[in-house]
Amino acid sequence: MDFKDINEKIDTVEGFFQPLDQYIWDWILTLQNEENLFGHLVEFGVYKGKSLCKLAQHQKVGEHILGVDCSLSLEGMKTSVMNAVKKTSNISLAYVNLLDCMTEYLYTTRYTSEGGATTEFRNKARFLHIDAGHSGYNVYEDLKLADRYLSPNGILVMDDWTTRFYPDLVDAFYRYIITNPNSFKILMISECKMYACRPKEYSNYIWRMETKMIPFMKEHYNKPIKIFKTKNYVDSAKLVIMHESEYSKVDPQDNAIDVLV
């Protein structure tokens, strides 16, 4: 797969999606495909469909794309998103499902496509991205459905994790995992997003990130980056990935980090 080419296509879609995260998604989704991990691709908060198009680029036959966003009820929005998916990927639009509702609705309702078929998402999503309402209430409700949908070896991504304008977002996540300790465990923080998995898969994904993601990013991402790992506590080590210019602001004497690249 030509990652530069597919990301240039993504850049033609209106919206917000950091290039660094685009390549991180490419690595995760490619890894899952190489390891024959089957599962649906889900997004809460679609906007113009920019990141949904990235999911569509990695969809395998039989997998469904599900986008949930109340703004999809606006005139022309669904058509606009579908057109964006069509021009950036080769996916059959029959597998793209767009819903204009709150995630609370789906928590109590099995999703039925416009064709009448029922698609089961419970424990079936291998990749789930949350970028919807940023209030504590909205995020908590999104996490409830994400916990229901995410497969045992799936990846959860949350947007705007490092944006200080949305403190409720981080607070809601920690409130959720304190109440539901077997739900999610943080793997990595980028300059914008947080990446998590099921706790039982944590060591497997951390190992893959340390041994496989670094070579991938060196080969395909054309900007200098730093990846480092917190090491205060062995059982809660996290990876952090950022551009070298941002890393220069980190205190080099900080013994809480272990620079990997």
Regions found by a protein language model. Name each.
Residues 2-15, 22, 26-261:
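S-adenosylmethionine/decaboxylated-SAM
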